[in-house]
């Protein structure tokens, strides 16, 4: 239990403070006693399921809230603290499924902080305590902070005697764990015999067993293929794999391990955490390449921010950053509470996985007719945003995930990635859940649904011309930033144009009409909108005009400012380059990359229409699938009518070629990473494509150049590993102007010029 509690956080929880202590409190009421007892019971239940059954009954974020509430009550009413309180224990209870073994020294948990402000307070407090308790040590050598990734895996304790692995155990309750030696021996990275000489007589080595992100995806695919429910996350998969009764089954799972500390030791003298890491690596144990020894708070903050941005580029899942005082003398001086060390803390990133209720599964009809199921959930906050819907892709995915309507589900939202329903929490089913059944008819137009061709997983509505939902989606798409870039034509405007509540005849019944609109066409359009009462949605819908103001006796109805903006932007959109027009047409498989390639190769819509399928397929970045989709699209009369109508309304259907731009990058694949001074990302991509090159989003052995600006990320690391030529911005400009030969020559000259003459 944390020693002191003070300032109230915005979320109502109490954070630690060095100077504040709990205020005297009245005798706890019966309701508070009942809440305390339930918290103790629930947390112990959730812990047992998490540590011993590889089952997450609540999300990590929910567990943290419950645990902090328990700590808050105990701080205000210490007389309530019971011996079986989770705050008095380190981890989960020991399962009866494996032989219990006692650790030589206790394995502690870590204190968690959830904000930068809390972390700063902890560091200030730890620094002050270190100066007070280990003043001479700190004066001689200022504190350094070993900062490392908090792997989201299963804690394991390895015991070596004279370099020989004699036992491996789970953390358990921190004092007693479960003997899993035979299963751990199946992990290839773990040596049975340590390397080197003068090995300690006995040493405990702590680490984390995990499944790498890419291996987890493959494992779940394999499991689903056998008809079983997939694992909810890599941590559960690792825990379940280590608890297999037969080591041969564990050996089939892609387990890995990284070690991060030393427990008890006999015959080993080491001065710091970082020194011990170097020793562990020399012994042949797998250590993390990501740890750093830092000297100040700002460096720690930079480390946290860096991996907060790049956490999904890593080998494994992380849920935070661990910060430790590096030297052991200071650690020993600070010591431990009953549960956590006073010299280490875990900063937890905002949760990316939460639990919520799956209320229903509905379907959406997309712009190319694809019918996609999506989950409707109780709104929940995850990764900084509130989510209440998530795609389920197709009926096979729904089946593979094993989700039922009414399930409590694990919802994941990683960074900018779209929210994903990972799977159900099976232990919380009560028998009232029901299966999702894919509709056989389009919910928008009633047309029979079917795969586009035999063997397709996706089912589609073939009524592209007349399906109202498909038209709405296409109109919304053509206004997007990657197409005509019409900001005033958003989702609600697309509904108003194609599916208004009034009038019965929509202003836009085919996207051919979009550039032929006049303001008067929109005067009577009304949509249904949820009414607000004092700024709060009421659940009551009303009919409101969308494109015109309501109007009064004094002031007649007139176009809104957004409607005026819409017509200005429609006029501006007519001058967009050819590739954007191609994107706006919603041709299946034809995205920005293929559209740019087609526009560069042919120069005009007429030339693209006249090209044969082999001619289209020969274009770099197009290929046979896209070529076939183009031929199929242009074969429809009503598709060609859209192009003709847009052309008649002034939309540009040919690019003015700048013959002065040489095709210096023909056949080259280039990746841009980081920030450039003279180019934003789109401008750099445009410059590459205009010169005949391919602008790729990821580095591979087929990449010719990587252009690295400021804050270049993992793409730069990968380029260096693969031996791909890396250019700075000046080198990129040389490459654009003169091509690869001149760029290589410039590099060689620069290299020669940097040598010194004796």
Swiss-Prot record:
<feature type="binding site">
    <location>
        <begin position="60"/>
        <end position="64"/>
    </location>
    <ligand>
        <name>NAD(+)</name>
    </ligand>
</feature>
<dbReference type="GO" id="GO:0005829">
    <property type="term" value="C:cytosol"/>
</dbReference>
<feature type="binding site">
    <location>
        <begin position="109"/>
        <end position="110"/>
    </location>
    <ligand>
        <name>NAD(+)</name>
    </ligand>
</feature>
<comment type="function">
    <text>DNA ligase that catalyzes the formation of phosphodiester linkages between 5'-phosphoryl and 3'-hydroxyl groups in double-stranded DNA using NAD as a coenzyme and as the energy source for the reaction. It is essential for DNA replication and repair of damaged DNA.</text>
</comment>
<dbReference type="InterPro" id="IPR010994">
    <property type="entry name" value="RuvA_2-like"/>
</dbReference>
<dbReference type="GO" id="GO:0046872">
    <property type="term" value="F:metal ion binding"/>
</dbReference>
<protein>
    <recommendedName>
        <fullName>DNA ligase</fullName>
        <ecNumber>6.5.1.2</ecNumber>
    </recommendedName>
</protein>
<feature type="binding site">
    <location>
        <position position="461"/>
    </location>
    <ligand>
        <name>Zn(2+)</name>
    </ligand>
</feature>
<dbReference type="GO" id="GO:0006281">
    <property type="term" value="P:DNA repair"/>
</dbReference>
<keyword id="KW-0235">DNA replication</keyword>
<keyword id="KW-0227">DNA damage</keyword>
<dbReference type="InterPro" id="IPR004149">
    <property type="entry name" value="Znf_DNAligase_C4"/>
</dbReference>
<dbReference type="InterPro" id="IPR013840">
    <property type="entry name" value="DNAligase_N"/>
</dbReference>
<feature type="region of interest" description="Disordered">
    <location>
        <begin position="735"/>
        <end position="758"/>
    </location>
</feature>
<dbReference type="InterPro" id="IPR033136">
    <property type="entry name" value="DNA_ligase_CS"/>
</dbReference>
<keyword id="KW-0520">NAD</keyword>
<feature type="binding site">
    <location>
        <position position="208"/>
    </location>
    <ligand>
        <name>NAD(+)</name>
    </ligand>
</feature>
<dbReference type="InterPro" id="IPR001357">
    <property type="entry name" value="BRCT_dom"/>
</dbReference>
<keyword id="KW-0479">Metal-binding</keyword>
<feature type="binding site">
    <location>
        <position position="467"/>
    </location>
    <ligand>
        <name>Zn(2+)</name>
    </ligand>
</feature>
<keyword id="KW-0234">DNA repair</keyword>
<keyword id="KW-0460">Magnesium</keyword>
<keyword id="KW-0436">Ligase</keyword>
<dbReference type="InterPro" id="IPR013839">
    <property type="entry name" value="DNAligase_adenylation"/>
</dbReference>
<dbReference type="InterPro" id="IPR001679">
    <property type="entry name" value="DNA_ligase"/>
</dbReference>
<feature type="binding site">
    <location>
        <position position="324"/>
    </location>
    <ligand>
        <name>NAD(+)</name>
    </ligand>
</feature>
<feature type="binding site">
    <location>
        <position position="348"/>
    </location>
    <ligand>
        <name>NAD(+)</name>
    </ligand>
</feature>
<dbReference type="GO" id="GO:0003911">
    <property type="term" value="F:DNA ligase (NAD+) activity"/>
</dbReference>
<dbReference type="InterPro" id="IPR036420">
    <property type="entry name" value="BRCT_dom_sf"/>
</dbReference>
<dbReference type="Pfam" id="PF01653">
    <property type="entry name" value="DNA_ligase_aden"/>
</dbReference>
<dbReference type="Pfam" id="PF03119">
    <property type="entry name" value="DNA_ligase_ZBD"/>
</dbReference>
<keyword id="KW-0464">Manganese</keyword>
<dbReference type="InterPro" id="IPR041663">
    <property type="entry name" value="DisA/LigA_HHH"/>
</dbReference>
<dbReference type="Pfam" id="PF12826">
    <property type="entry name" value="HHH_2"/>
</dbReference>
<dbReference type="GO" id="GO:0006260">
    <property type="term" value="P:DNA replication"/>
</dbReference>
<dbReference type="Pfam" id="PF00533">
    <property type="entry name" value="BRCT"/>
</dbReference>
<feature type="binding site">
    <location>
        <position position="171"/>
    </location>
    <ligand>
        <name>NAD(+)</name>
    </ligand>
</feature>
<feature type="binding site">
    <location>
        <position position="442"/>
    </location>
    <ligand>
        <name>Zn(2+)</name>
    </ligand>
</feature>
<dbReference type="Pfam" id="PF03120">
    <property type="entry name" value="DNA_ligase_OB"/>
</dbReference>
<feature type="binding site">
    <location>
        <position position="148"/>
    </location>
    <ligand>
        <name>NAD(+)</name>
    </ligand>
</feature>
<keyword id="KW-0862">Zinc</keyword>
<comment type="similarity">
    <text>Belongs to the NAD-dependent DNA ligase family. LigA subfamily.</text>
</comment>
């Amino acid at each position: 239990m944390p020693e002191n509690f003070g300032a109230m956080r915005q979320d109502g929880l109490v954070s630690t403070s060095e100077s504040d202590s709990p205020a005297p409190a009245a005798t706890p009421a019966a309701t508070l006693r009942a809440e305390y007892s339930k918290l103790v019971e629930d947390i112990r239940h959730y812990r047992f399921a998490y540590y011993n059954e590889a089952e997450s009954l609540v999300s990590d974020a929910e567990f943290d809230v419950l645990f902090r509430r328990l700590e808050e009550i105990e701080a205000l009413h210490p007389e309530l603290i019971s011996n079986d309180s989770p705050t008095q224990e380190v981890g989960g209870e020991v399962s009866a499924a494996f032989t219990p073994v006692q650790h030589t020294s206790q394995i502690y948990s870590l204190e968690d902080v959830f904000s930068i402000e809390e972390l700063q307070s902890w560091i200030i407090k730890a620094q002050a305590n270190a100066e007070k308790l280990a003043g001479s040590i700190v004066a001689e050598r200022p504190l350094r902070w070993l900062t490392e990734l908090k792997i989201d895996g299963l804690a394991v304790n390895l015991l070596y005697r004279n370099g020989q692995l004699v036992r491996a155990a789970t953390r358990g309750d921190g004092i007693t764990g479960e003997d899993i030696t035979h299963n751990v021996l199946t992990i290839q990275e773990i040596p049975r015999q340590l390397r080197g000489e003068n090995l300690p007589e006995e040493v405990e080595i702590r680490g984390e067993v995990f499944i790498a992100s890419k291996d987890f995806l493959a494992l779940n695919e394999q499991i689903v293929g056998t008809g079983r429910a997939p694992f909810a996350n890599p941590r559960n998969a690792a825990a379940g794999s280590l608890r297999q009764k037969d080591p041969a089954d564990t050996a089939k799972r892609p387990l890995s391990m990284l070690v991060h500390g030393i427990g008890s030791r006999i015959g080993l003298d080491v001065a710091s955490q970082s020194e011990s890491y170097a020793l562990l690596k020399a012994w042949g144990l797998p250590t993390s390449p990501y740890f750093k020894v830092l000297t100040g708070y700002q460096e720690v903050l930079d480390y946290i921010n860096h991996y907060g941005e790049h956490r999904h580029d890593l080998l494994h899942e992380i849920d935070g950053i661990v910060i430790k005082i590096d030297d052991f003398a200071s650690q020993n001086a600070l010591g431990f509470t009953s549960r956590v060390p006073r010299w280490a803390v875990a900063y937890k990133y905002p949760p990316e996985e939460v639990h919520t209720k799956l209320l229903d599964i509905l379907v959406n009809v997309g712009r190319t007719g694809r019918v996609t199921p999506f989950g409707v959930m109780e709104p929940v906050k995850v990764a900084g945003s509130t989510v209440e819907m998530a795609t389920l892709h197709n009926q096979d995915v729904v089946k593979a995930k094993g989700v039922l309507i009414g399930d409590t589900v694990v919802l994941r939202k990683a960074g900018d990635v779209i929210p994903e329903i990972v799977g159900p929490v099976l232990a919380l089913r009560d028998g009232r859940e029901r299966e999702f059944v894919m509709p056989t008819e389009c919910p928008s137009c009633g047309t029979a649904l079917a795969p586009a061709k035999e063997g397709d997983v996706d089912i589609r509505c073939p009524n592209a011309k007349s399906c109202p939902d498909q038209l709405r989606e296409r109109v919304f798409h053509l206004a997007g930033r990657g197409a005509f870039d019409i900001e005033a034509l958003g989702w609600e405007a697309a509904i108003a144009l194609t599916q208004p509540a009034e009038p019965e005849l929509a202003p836009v019944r085919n996207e051919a009409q979009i550039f032929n609109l006049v303001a008067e066409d929109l005067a009577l359009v009304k949509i249904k909108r949820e009414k607000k009462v004092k700024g709060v949605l009421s659940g009551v819908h009303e009919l409101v005009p969308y494109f015109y103001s309501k109007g009064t006796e004094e002031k007649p109805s007139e176009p809104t400012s957004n409607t005026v903006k819409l017509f200005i932007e429609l006029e501006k959109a007519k001058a967009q380059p050819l590739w954007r027009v191609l994107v706006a047409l919603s041709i299946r498989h034809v995205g920005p990359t293929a559209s740019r390639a087609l526009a560069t190769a042919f120069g005009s819509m007429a030339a693209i229409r006249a090209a044969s399928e082999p001619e289209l397929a020969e274009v770099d970045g197009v290929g046979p699938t896209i070529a076939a989709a183009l031929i199929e699209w242009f074969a429809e009369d009503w598709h060609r009518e859209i192009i003709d109508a847009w052309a008649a309304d002034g939309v540009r259907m040919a690019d003015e070629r700048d013959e002065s731009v040489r095709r210096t990058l023909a056949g080259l694949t280039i990746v841009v990473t980081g920030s450039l001074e003279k180019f934003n990302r789109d401008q750099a991509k445009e410059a590459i494509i205009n010169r005949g090159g391919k602008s790729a989003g990821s580095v591979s052995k087929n990449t010719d150049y990587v252009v690295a600006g400021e804050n270049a990320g993992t793409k730069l690391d990968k380029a260096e590993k693969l031996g791909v030529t890396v250019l700075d911005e000046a080198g990129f400009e040389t490459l654009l102007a003169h091509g690869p030969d001149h760029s290589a020559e410039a590099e060689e000259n620069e290299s020669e010029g940097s040598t010194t003459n004796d």
